[in-house]
């Protein structure tokens, strides 16, 4: 479940990043571009009243054309808000207005959606651009990591998310030191010391469970144990430590201090391990992909044409796609037969006339979409799971450079030589610089 949640989060991040890029590059001819963000606890009526008031003020705009465009955009926003009886649980994001397309023509744009997680920003603008920086809060991708710093004086519990560290819990302890007396006193004090250490270790384990497991679910992606003595090593091996947390240990480090000074040192020493864990899902899935290729299992596919054909056939179970893949999905219509077909080509082939002829018939260009964006919206329709791959890990970089940046795991073995793709008129792999 945790892996699936992470995968879904990656897909949502991809959609937000693409939307931000698209809106940031969009321009209008006037000041009729409405940006509206409503946080979860704010009433829809408050925003409706705000825009209605702004509509009245817009009558003072001297330029008639701009005034009409501004008021049209506000009316569109108000009409869209009427469809919502209340603010969605995660808030509401809306962008609308008249914008210029690639040909410089003015078109109407309207986007509204509930973000995948709560957005705590309240925003309204109506000017010459869309305000998208506030959507960046939805892209906080760094997972939280837990830290336990323990020594002879006590234990500290903290988490680290991105550059933000938070102390979650701490307690002090007084442990008896080694006693210099001999005879029976020595044995008794040694026994007391062992008992006190055992009780301390047990409390560390109990507080760790209370701190890093909530509602029976682990709330950190990995754990770092730190300390100046043997306590951290004993913690990693004791049966008292919750096994759900024990399997999350990614690093054990020696630090010179306890408390927050020890935490700072532990964060510094664990940086490499934290980076590796962030890409562990990516590393695992690509390593499995490479293993299948190495043994010629017949259960994986790569390359744009073969991968997309098998996805459309419902054969692919898991699809892997480089998040920056620039491949286009082009929808064409035969002007005579009205048959609809799709091809997958790089951007520099978009205006090549050979892609828009079928014998003597011309093919009309109906729609052009980025393939990765199309996959993010439609992958589930084919019963597949989608993994977005970066080039930030060694495995991801190899997948992008050596396997076209797209591939998949098949539900069953397929003879790839017999794939028939009626639209496979372009050998994508021969084109350089397609990623």
From Swiss-Prot:
Gene Ontology MF terms: translation release factor activity
Subcellular location, record wording: Cytoplasm
SUPFAM superfamilies: L30e-like (SSF55315), N-terminal domain of eukaryotic peptide chain release factor subunit 1, ERF1 (SSF55481), Translational machinery components (SSF53137)
Residues forming coiled coils: none
Cellular component terms (Gene Ontology): cytoplasm
InterPro entries: eFR1_2_sf, eRF1_1_Pelota, eRF1_1_sf, eRF1_2, eRF1_3, Peptide_chain-rel_eRF1/aRF1, Ribosomal_eL30-like_sf
This protein's UniProt keywords: Cytoplasm, Protein biosynthesis
Entry-linked SMART domains: eRF1_1 (SM01194)
Origin: domain of life: Eukaryota
Record function comment: Directs the termination of nascent peptide synthesis (translation) in response to the termination codon UGA. In T.thermophila UAA and UAG codes for glutamine.
Subunit structure: Heterodimer of two subunits, one of which binds GTP.
PANTHER family: PEPTIDE CHAIN RELEASE FACTOR SUBUNIT 1 (PTHR10113)
Family: Belongs to the eukaryotic release factor 1 family.
Name of this chain's protein: Eukaryotic peptide chain release factor subunit 1
Organism: Tetrahymena thermophila
């Amino acid at each position: 479940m945790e892996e699936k949640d992470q995968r879904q989060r990656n897909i949502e991040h991809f959609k937000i990043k693409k939307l931000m890029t698209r809106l940031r590059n969009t321009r209008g001819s006037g000041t009729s571009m409405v940006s509206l963000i409503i946080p979860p606890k704010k009433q829809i009526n408050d925003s409706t009243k705000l825009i209605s008031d702004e509509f009245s003020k817009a009558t003072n705009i001297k330029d008639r054309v701009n005034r009409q465009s501004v008021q049209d955009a506000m009316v569109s926003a108000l009409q869209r808000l009427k469809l919502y009886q209340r603010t969605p649980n995660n808030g509401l994001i809306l962008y609308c207005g008249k914008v210029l397309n690639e040909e410089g023509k003015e078109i109407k744009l309207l986007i509204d959606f509930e973000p995948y997680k709560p957005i705590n920003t309240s925003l309204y603008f109506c000017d010459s651009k869309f305000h998208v920086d506030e959507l960046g809060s939805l892209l906080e991708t760094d997972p939280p990591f837990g830290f336990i710093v323990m020594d002879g004086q006590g234990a500290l519990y903290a988490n680290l998310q991105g550059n933000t560290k938070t102390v979650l819990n701490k307690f002090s302890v007084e442990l008896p030191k080694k006693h210099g007396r001999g005879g029976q006193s020595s044995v008794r004090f040694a026994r007391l010391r062992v008992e006190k250490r055992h009780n301390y270790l047990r409390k560390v384990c109990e507080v760790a469970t209370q701190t890093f497991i909530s509602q029976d679910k682990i709330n950190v992606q990995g754990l770092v144990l730190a300390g100046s003595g043997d306590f951290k090593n004993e913690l990693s091996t004791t049966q008292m430590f919750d096994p759900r947390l024990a399997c999350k240990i990614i690093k054990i480090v020696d630090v010179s201090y306890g408390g927050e000074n020890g935490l700072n040192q532990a964060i510094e020493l664990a940086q490499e391990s934290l980076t590796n864990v962030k890409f562990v899902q990516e590393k695992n899935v690509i390593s499995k992909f490479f293993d299948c290729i190495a043994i010629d299992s017949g259960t994986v596919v790569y390359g744009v044409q073969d991968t997309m054909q098998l996805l459309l056939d419902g054969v692919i179970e898991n699809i892997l796609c480089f998040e920056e893949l620039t491949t286009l999905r082009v929808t064409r219509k035969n002007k005579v037969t009205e048959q609809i077909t799709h091809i997958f080509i790089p951007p520099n082939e978009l205006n090549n006339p050979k892609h828009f002829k079928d014998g003597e018939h011309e093919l009309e260009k109906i729609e052009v979409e980025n393939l990765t964006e199309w996959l993010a919206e439609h992958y589930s329709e084919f019963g597949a799971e989608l993994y977005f791959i970066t080039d930030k890990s060694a495995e991801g970089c190899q997948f992008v450079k050596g396997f076209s940046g797209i591939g998949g795991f098949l539900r069953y073995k397929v003879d790839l030589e017999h794939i028939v793709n009626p639209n496979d008129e372009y050998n994508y792999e021969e084109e350089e610089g397609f990623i």
